[in-house]
Amino acid sequence: PVVDTTGNNPLQQQEEYYV
């Protein structure tokens, strides 16, 4: 899980990587 700063929940494991 990567910490995305796109406004989504960073605590949620997502397979999409937001840069």
Swiss-Prot record:
It comes from the Eukaryota. One of its GO terms (biological process) is defense response to bacterium. It is found in: Cytoplasm. The keyword Cytoplasm applies. One of its GO terms (cellular component) is cytoplasm. GO terms for molecular function: serine-type endopeptidase inhibitor activity. Its main location: cytoplasm. Keywords: Antibiotic, Antimicrobial, Cytoplasm, Protease inhibitor, Serine protease inhibitor. Serine protease inhibitor. Displays antimicrobial activity against the Gram-negative bacterium S.typhimurium ATCC 14028. Displays no hemolytic activity. This is Kunitz-type serine protease inhibitor 1. It comes from Xanthosoma sagittifolium.
